[in-house]
């Protein structure tokens, strides 16, 4: 193996006739030789350590490929193999479908889409159309089953099938008990209100009765006193059945009182007249004057 200088980025690499990787850069002093020194004129910046040394490519003849074996279109599908081709547009390439790994991909669509300006309509195989339908059925079946987890970590989750709404919906509760309870409450409240109202009315009535009874007793006492005052004036009480005196009514007592008062006024007037005559016949020395008119008046 021949060692040469490390080429830089501008160095061109070619294959010669005997299949060896040869550097076209002219040879310079070898930095690893024994007579190398720091004083030697070496362009250290021209060395590129990233590029390897030239090495021979010893490839056997049976591994060499004949250009006739390569097809004219590298990206075209083989003629004897027919697979499932699915179009991959710009939107489908960014799709996040996690279950489309088993669907084949045809590279011919990419090459044809780049070469032609108007791509053909994508063809979808029946297998690819059946797959999403079956997956949708399985997902709907999984959603129909409700998984119930237990609060205890030792118990495993149990799956219970979700029954139909008609079977699980309970029968409507009867409305009569709440209505009866509300009616009872209303009746109780009404009864309590009526009881309180009747109690208040009874208290007012009792107080009024007490006041009225006291007034009647006082009035009766006044009428009795008036009746007793008129008994000495000659006013007789009417008899009831002729058996004896009976109590007068209030109206009769008032009538007798009016007559008695009139009689008293007449007597008072006669007395005042007599007093005036006596004053006229009385002398200043206390002597009484005798005349015929006074004698007639006395008689």
Curated annotation (Swiss-Prot):
Key transcription factors critical for hypoxia adaptation and virulence. Plays a major role in regulation of heme biosynthesis and carbohydrate metabolism early in the response to hypoxia. Residues 254-281 form a coiled coil. Residues 217-264 are annotated as: Helix-loop-helix motif. Keywords: Coiled coil, Nucleus, Transcription, Transcription regulation. Residues 203-264 form the bHLH domain. Disruption phenotype: Impairs growth in a hypoxic environment and subsequent virulence. Induction: Expression is positively regulated by the transcription factor srbA. PROSITE patterns: BHLH. This is Transcription factor srbB. The keyword DNA damage does not apply. It comes from Aspergillus fumigatus (strain ATCC MYA-4609 / CBS 101355 / FGSC A1100 / Af293). InterPro entries: bHLH_dom, HLH_DNA-bd_sf, Regulatory_TF_Diverse. SMART domains: HLH. One of its GO terms (cellular component) is nucleus. Residues 161-170 have a biased composition (Low complexity). It is found in: Nucleus. Residues 203-216 are annotated as: Basic motif. Residues 1-33, 81-204 are annotated as: Disordered. CDD domains: bHLHzip_SREBP_like. Residues 188-199 have a biased composition (Polar residues).
